[in-house]
Amino acid sequence: MNKAELIRNNIEKQVCSFFGSRSVTDFTPGLTPVPYAGRVYDEKELTALVDSALDFWLTAGRYARTFEEKLAEFTGARYSILTNSGSSAD
């Protein structure tokens, strides 16, 4: 494993630790706020985000390609492509 891979692995571990330190697990009815909307993600999504950023893929990259391939397979379509909105897909 080269130096860059070692650093990347360390960053992934740190991101997981960061996520774990921010997670709220206790809920007290009447005291704990329940947001009506908001971001919902786990440590896997957070590490994927950081991993993409380390490759400087700020738009569609290898994760998008993998998702497109799996979506096409799941739906039985020959191809699939991600867009940023329904308007862009027109």
Enumerate the predicted regions with their spans.
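Conserved PLP-binding active-site segment in aminotransferase class I/II-type PLP enzymes
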Residues: M1-S88
